[in-house]
From Swiss-Prot:
Family per record: Belongs to the quinolinate synthase family. Type 3 subfamily.
Intracellular or extracellular location(s): Cytoplasm
Full protein name: Quinolinate synthase
Position of the signal peptide: none
Superkingdom: Bacteria
Protein EC: 2.5.1.72
One Pfam entry name: NadA
Note on how the cofactor is bound: Binds 1 [4Fe-4S] cluster per subunit.
Organism annotation: Nocardioides sp. (strain ATCC BAA-499 / JS614)
Known pathway: Cofactor biosynthesis; NAD(+) biosynthesis; quinolinate from iminoaspartate: step 1/1
Main location: cytoplasm
Keyword terms, alphabetized: 4Fe-4S, Cytoplasm, Iron, Iron-sulfur, Metal-binding, Pyridine nucleotide biosynthesis, Transferase
Residues binding iminosuccinate, per UniProt: 57, 74, 153-155, 174, 276-278, 293
Length: 394
């Protein structure tokens, strides 16, 4: 099935926390924005000049991404913002945790703006600080907290990053998760000893990394459910585990079904299955290649003309890759699936409103992380940046 033929179902009703497969996706594409807004956005950007720097995540819609000064994954964009100290305003076309990370990494004279404050992340919201602190207390009660290092995926709130910083842990991306877990185990004597990891908030990235990259078994991993007493685990299970996975997932990547892979291989000769590690372990086992958004982009760029690919990641990115590489047969790894509904809250009307407000001298939707949280979250990020040898890209 080509991108053009795909029945599009972009707007979810919200995350089903009891399901591994994310959200329901009724509805149609959002209506196209008024073409006049394009000229207004251009005029506002021109009026602001170098005072504004617009960041666009790979999953943003085309009407927004055209105005980005830089596109990339969440951590690349935060670092790009930090590398532009002369820009007074950082307009982040992404979601809330990304804007928080940009605020943490930029200077005090810079202001980070999120065009729509409702652009959150369901995965990041699955790990709340109070829940994580309760889990930490339960680990202490089980007698294992002193052996645990918390590791959080970049896709988490500043509060969770700070929790990891305070408790000897760090942040990771999908590219450096393996080396981050290796570092974490080493802090408590190594994987062969009593060391354990609490991995937040994406269980699938944690499981895929622990099992497929580090050689642990699926049975070495247990899942902590914050909605069940004791996480749904016994003290004995906690003591036996090597990796304690938080019960979180990406609502988009969680929808891809392993069954689709078999159908695609039967209908598209020679198709290569390329997926993001936020997908379920069962799907990843059936894929040919697994990697971050940057890895996916580079893989398609380097692929030979005429090759066939089915990609399991957010649809906006897959559509752009298909348009950019017409010499390759690129399809989407499902018959119907959501766009990231929260990412798509950043639309052209919100971007124009944010930019025109700046032209008028008003800062709207500023994202500010409080100083204490920023200090500890920055420590967790700096530990990641000090890791040897691996990319720090999503």
């Amino acid at each position: 099935m080509t991108i053009a033929d795909l029945p599009l179902l972009p707007l979810g009703r919200g995350t089903d926390l009891t399901s591994e497969r994310g959200v329901e996706c009724p509805g149609d594409l959002p209506p196209a924005s008024d073409p006049a807004l394009v000229e207004r956005a251009r005029a506002a950007k021109a009026a602001l000049g170098d005072r504004v720097f617009v960041l666009g995540h790979h999953y943003q819609r085309d009407e927004v991404i055209q105005f980005a000064d830089v596109t990339g994954d969440s951590f690349k964009l935060a670092r790009e913002a930090a590398a532009r100290p002369d820009a007074e305003y950082i307009v982040f076309c992404g979601v809330h945790f990304m804007a928080e990370s940009a605020d943490i990494l930029t200077g005090p004279s810079q202001q980070v703006i999120l065009p729509d404050l409702a652009a959150g992340c369901s995965m990041a919201d699955m790990a709340r600080l109070t829940q994580v602190e309760m889990a930490w207390d339960a680990l202490a009660a089980a007698g294992v907290a002193d052996s645990v290092v918390p590791v959080t995926y970049m896709n988490s709130s500043a509060d969770i990053k700070a929790f990891c910083g305070r408790n000897g842990g760090l942040v990771c991306t999908s590219s450096n998760a393996e080396v981050a877990l290796e570092w974490a185990f080493e802090q408590k004597g190594g994987v062969e000893g009593d060391a354990k990891i609490l991995f937040l908030p994406d269980q699938h990235l944690g499981r895929n990394t622990a099992v497929l990259k580090m050689g642990l078994s699926v049975d070495d991993c247990v899942v902590w459910d914050p909605f069940r007493p004791g996480g749904g685990l016994t003290p004995e299970q906690l003591r036996a585990a090597k990796v304690i996975l938080w019960r979180g997932h990406c609502s988009v990547h969680g929808k891809f079904s392993p069954d689709v892979v078999d159908e695609l291989r039967a209908t598209i000769p020679g198709v290569q299955i390329l997926v993001h590690p936020e997908c379920t372990h069962e799907l990843v086992l059936k894929a040919d290649l697994v990697g971050s958004t940057e890895f996916i982009i580079k893989t398609i760029e380097a692929a030979p003309s005429g090759s066939s690919w089915s990609i399991g990641t957010e649809l906006n990115l897959v559509k752009r890759l298909s348009a950019a590489h017409p010499d390759k047969n690129i399809s989407f790894l499902d018959k119907t699936v959501c766009y990231c509904s929260t990412m798509n809250r950043i639309d052209l009307p919100h971007l124009v409103w944010a930019l025109e407000s700046l032209v008028a001298g008003t800062v709207v939707n500023r994202i500010e992380v409080d100083p204490e949280t920023e200090t500890w979250a920055l420590l967790a990020l700096e530990r990641m940046l000090a890791l040897p040898g691996k990319s720090h890209k999503d």
